[in-house]
């Protein structure tokens, strides 16, 4: 079985000021997910996208603690950064769930980014 899993970002939905190009590219990934799933369905290929929020990556973890705390304060629940293992768990679920196709799933603790 073949499954394509793209990575977008919540910036596709909540782009901040100064992120025009980044938000547009991530929006493009979201926008191509359903048509791609439809186009590839005839050959048995599924396509989904994950739009992660603020994840505990090496780049973010290298930021000052005050910056990290400020970011976490805007995440409703759970009030923490997302873990890479949680991203991996969602990938596994998308691969194993054969009825999940053409979808974009936000993995973001219900955060909505502010304009700045």
Show where each model-derived region lies.
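Residue(s) in the substrate-gating loop at a strand-loop-helix junction
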Residues: 9
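Conserved catalytic-site region of short-chain dehydrogenase/reductase
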Residues: 12-14, 113
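Cytosolic ligand/metal-binding cores
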Residues: 20
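Active-site helix of classical SDR
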Residues: 25, 33
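Alpha-helical segment proximal to the catalytic Tyr-Lys
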Residues: 38-42
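Short, flexible catalytic-loop segment of classical short-chain dehydrogenase/reductase
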Residues: 51-62
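Catalytic Tyr-x(3-8)-Lys segment
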Residues: 66-86
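C-terminal substrate-recognition "lid" of short-chain dehydrogenase/reductases
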Residues: 83-107, 112
């Amino acid at each position: 079985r073949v499954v394509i899993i793209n990575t977008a970002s919540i910036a596709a939905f909540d782009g901040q000021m100064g992120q025009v190009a980044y938000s547009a590219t991530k929006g493009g990934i979201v926008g191509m997910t359903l048509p791609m799933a439809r186009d590839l369905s005839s050959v048995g290929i599924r396509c989904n996208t994950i739009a992660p929020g603020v994840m505990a990556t090496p780049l973010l973890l290298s930021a000052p603690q005050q910056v990290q705390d400020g970011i976490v304060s805007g995440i409703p629940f759970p009030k923490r950064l997302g873990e890479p293992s949680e991203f991996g768990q969602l990938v596994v679920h998308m691969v194993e769930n054969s009825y999940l196709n053409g979808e974009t799933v936000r993995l973001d603790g219900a955060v909505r980014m502010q304009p700045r």
